[in-house]
C-alpha cells in the first residue's frame, strides 16, 4: 500500500512539473528552432537548385537521345523506301 501511495505521489509530482514547464517554457528552447530555421531554408534552396540542375541534365540527355532516335528512324525509313523501290523496279 505504501508503495502504491509513493508511486501515485511521484506521478502527481511528474504531471505537476510538466504543467509548470509547459506554462513557463525555457527561452533558450524557443531560440533554438528560430536559429535553425535559416539552415533549413538554405538546405531547401540548395536541394531545389540541385533538383533543377538534375532535371535540366536529364532533359538535355533525353533531347540528345530523341534526336539520335529520330535520325536512326529516318535512315531506316529511307533504306526501306530504297529497298521497296528496287524491288518494285525488278518486278
Swiss-Prot record:
CC terms in the record's Gene Ontology section: extracellular region
Single GO MF descriptor: antifreeze activity
Entry keyword annotation includes Repressor: no
Propiece residues: 22-39
InterPro entries associated with the record: Antifreeze_1
Keyword annotations of the record: Antifreeze protein, Repeat, Secreted, Signal
Annotated signal sequence range: 1-21
Record-annotated disulphide pairs: none
Subcellular compartments: Secreted
Keyword flag Phosphoprotein: no
Protein purpose: Contributes to protect fish blood from freezing at subzero sea water temperatures. Lowers the blood freezing point. Binds to nascent ice crystals and prevents further growth.
The family this protein is said to belong to: Belongs to the type-I AFP family.
The protein, known as: Ice-structuring protein
Source organism of the structure: Pseudopleuronectes americanus
Amino acid at each position: 500500500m505504501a508503495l502504491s501511495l509513493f508511486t501515485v505521489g511521484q506521478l502527481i509530482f511528474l504531471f505537476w512539473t510538466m504543467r509548470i514547464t509547459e506554462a513557463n517554457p525555457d527561452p533558450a528552447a524557443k531560440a533554438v528552432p528560430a536559429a535553425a530555421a535559416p539552415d533549413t531554408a538554405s538546405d531547401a534552396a540548395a536541394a531545389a537548385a540541385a533538383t533543377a540542375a538534375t532535371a535540366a541534365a536529364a532533359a538535355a540527355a533525353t533531347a540528345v537521345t530523341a534526336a539520335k532516335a529520330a535520325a536512326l528512324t529516318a535512315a531506316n525509313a529511307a533504306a526501306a523506301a530504297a529497298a521497296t523501290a528496287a524491288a518494285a523496279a525488278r518486278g
